[in-house]
Curated annotation (Swiss-Prot):
This is Genome polyprotein. Keywords: Capsid protein, Virion. One of its GO terms (cellular component) is viral capsid. InterPro entries: Poty_coat. Genome polyprotein of potyviruses undergoes post-translational proteolytic processing by the main proteinase NIa-pro resulting in the production of at least ten individual proteins. The P1 proteinase and the HC-pro cleave only their respective C-termini autocatalytically. 6K1 is essential for proper proteolytic separation of P3 from CI. Belongs to the potyviridae genome polyprotein family. The keyword Metal-binding does not apply.
Length: 90
């Protein structure tokens, strides 16, 4: 995952909205956040495919790395877990 994570997790408690920084969660996660997210690799692929039914979509991770081959867009996220279904180029 990106070392530049600087967002917030927003929680509603009673009627008060509370923000917590995400960076400490990422820095101290055991197992690592990448290991946790790799469990959702199939779900991320399915989401990307769903978005592509609506219109052409390349995830931000692919755009930031100048990935121009749209056939590889379903593998364009940083916690992708290689499987036997994936092409060698992925």
């Amino acid at each position: 995952t990106s070392p530049n994570i600087n967002g917030f997790w927003v929680m509603l408690e009673n009627d008060e909205q509370i923000e917590f920084p995400i960076k400490p969660l990422i820095d101290h996660a055991r197992p690592t956040f990448r290991q946790i997210m790799s469990r959702f690799s199939d779900l991320a692929e399915a989401y990307i495919e769903k978005r592509n039914f609506e219109r052409a979509y390349m995830p931000r991770y692919g755009l930031q790395r100048n990935l121009t081959d749209m056939s590889l867009r379903r593998y364009a996220f940083d916690f992708y877990e290689m499987t036997s279904k994936a092409p060698a180029r992925a």
